[in-house]
Amino acid sequence: MFYPHHQSQQSTTTNPSKHHDSQDVRLPGTSSWSRHPSHPSFTPSLPMPSPSGYPPLGSGYPPGGHHHPNVNVHSGIHGPHPSFGSGMGGNGGMGHGQGFGMGMFQNGVQTSPPRGEPVPMTSHWQTQMMRAEASRSASSPHHRARAAAISSRATNKPAAVPIVDPNNRPSSSYGTNGLHRKNASSVFNGEPTGTPPLSDPSLTPAQNPAEPATPAPVAGQTESKDEEKPNEPWTGLDLGGIRLKRLSTALFSFTHVTSLYINHNALTSIPSAISSLRQLTLLDATGNELSTIPSEIGVLSKLKDLLLFDNNLTTLPFELGTLYQLDCLGIDGNPMNADYRKKLVEDGTRGLITYLRDHAPPPPPPPERQWIDLETDVDTPTSGKQESFSVLTYNILCASFAPATTYSYTPSWALDWDYRKRLLLEEIVTASADVVCLQEIDCKQYADYFYPMLKKEGYEGQHYPRSRAKTMSVDEQKLVDGCATFWKEEKFRLVETQVIEFNQLALQKTDMRTEDMFNRVMSRDNIAVVAALEFRASGGRLLVANSHIYWDHRYRDVKLVQIGMLMEELEKIVEQFSRYPVKLDTDPEYNNGKPPKYERSEKGRDIPLIMCVDLNSFSGSAVYDYLSSGSIPGDHEDFMSHLYGRYTASGLKHHLGLRSACAGIGEMRMTNFTPTFAAAIDYVFYTPRTMKVTSVLGDVDKAYLDKTVGFPNAHFPSDHIPVFTQFRIKGHLDPLPLNGDPYH
């Protein structure tokens, strides 16, 4: 997570037990916010990169030998590298025995250079040779553009037709479905296609034990909230066969390009700025004079064809290992490392890419995330000393939701659960938040690992699995994920815990038993866990809700119904909590020596409330607006014309007066980061009438993200990042407007 130890502006009278003032939770040998080395309580110790920068030998790491293998260079003299196949030969081909890239047929088409040893003609190598010969035959100037024009005339289409991937083929059998979650539907041009396998109303929760939690790309929005769909009329660019010696940087401003042909030129290098072309699916650099290719190509995660035939390449950057959708890596005609060539012959492109991915040294860690101060954390004379506390919410990516087929851009050792869980624990311990809310944590990992390890760090906790666990055997229940809430025992006392099961609530609402409620809502077994806490020192109360809302954007009506039911239950719980007897034996330093007092007329709305939620929705969505504004009309478009009784008849409304803790900074840039999705979907909501946000932890360094395909990776153990905030109780209740509505 890489965040520094936050130095609060708290006054000297502030509780000295506040997490960022304690010293005993720091990891030995590090500053208080560094990630490594491991905490001494970890068993076994978390293996970390050696001083050389490579992963050490041991369980969970790739085998030794992370340096580039020795290059097997063929004998022979390197002669000039031809870039054109036509107009250079007479009768008879050019000599095949001297150097690389010099063999040519009579028609001027380049052939593969000689090799010291014959290459076994496996199916993978046959494919390699077929693609190589196809690329070599396209050596004339603008070959693909001319072919596209001829094709358009033959089909009676306008002549000025763009190049639209003439080499486009069906999707790779190796690749994923284009989304970052298993079983999600594919998306083309922003429109979902196919039937969402996890959204079939006939499917019961028990039949979907690995339900994804992160939203699928939505219409017109396949990667992130801020990205716009390109509207250029062309997507291909053919600069082939024109003797280019260098590429202009202006080329890389065409970020919408999906196919780039720079084949059969005289290029000796490809600029690193090619990383700007994130939409590329095909890059053909055949027949140049390249001796290296930039590591930045590794961030072009949409690449399916990377054709580098007939160059002077002896090795490949490890960063190509993140090209998880690559179907064809063309290396024939290069004096390539013998081990790489052998791997390609035997295991194909996927085998070579996987080898590079798993043997790549860990990249440099990102800079620490920086704290952003919003308000001063000091006491006021009128309210006296008040409680300060910190909250961290984190979707930790359950092991059963992280198969290698879904996160194929992640090194196998970094995706391994033993590695990830230790890194997750280290993040939580290093943060030392007073309240920790985790989502996607299964029963086994909670009971066997996180609870006992966090117990040693002074935490107490509660965990509840999804509703489907009730219908499963004991062994099956262990793998069901849910929500866990932890709190510092020295700071809080647990009063009670309640679990809210959305599908059970739907069943109980007799006035809302519509067909849509049965088919769309009751089959989703998301939950919320509510912990009623009491500050040990001041006797003040704090209600903490921890929830995980359904993931699929195509079922955003379900999200609205779930969040509507959650708010109804929270209003009941806070009112019940307000009726509890007040603690009288409190620390006289707090609240000017007065015990806390809660008015019955407020119905619990004067009790500080925190809601940590993986909302699976953007700011500005219907569920976000409902939480932030207190109401949503019944005819809102996100109900999608479905019927949910009074919810769609009169709309949703609550009176808790919530606000996102990160609203003051315009929300996080992202809290979920994969190759196909990057946006903020995790939030901490609070009641601004009763407390204030003093600081929030900022975004991950943008320069680091620009060089990263997605999470998890060596430094980030989940596809989400934690949202970390610090609060201070006000000690008084801000007055309501005249109409009594906290939002107006």
From Swiss-Prot:
Statement: the UniProt record of this protein carries the keyword Phosphoprotein: no
Name of the molecule in the record: CCR4-Not complex 3'-5'-exoribonuclease subunit Ccr4
GO biological process, one term: nuclear-transcribed mRNA poly(A) tail shortening
Taxonomy, superkingdom: Eukaryota
PANTHER family named in the record: CARBON CATABOLITE REPRESSOR PROTEIN 4, POLY(A)-SPECIFIC RIBONUCLEASE
Catalytic activity: Exonucleolytic cleavage of poly(A) to 5'-AMP
Annotated spans, Disordered: 1-100, 132-235
Function of the protein: Acts as a catalytic component of the CCR4-NOT core complex, which in the nucleus seems to be a general transcription factor, and in the cytoplasm the major mRNA deadenylase involved in mRNA turnover. Ccr4 has 3'-5' RNase activity with a strong preference for polyadenylated substrates and also low exonuclease activity towards single-stranded DNA.
UniProt EC number: 3.1.13.4
LRR repeats: 231-254, 255-277, 279-300, 301-326
SUPFAM superfamilies in alphabetical order: DNase I-like, L domain-like
GO molecular function: metal ion binding; poly(A)-specific ribonuclease activity; RNA binding
Compartments, record wording: Cytoplasm; Nucleus
Pfam families noted in UniProt: Exo_endo_phos (PF03372), LRR_8 (PF13855)
Keywords: Cytoplasm, Exonuclease, Hydrolase, Leucine-rich repeat, Magnesium, Metal-binding, Nuclease, Nucleus, Repeat, RNA-binding, Transcription, Transcription regulation
Chain's gene name: CCR4
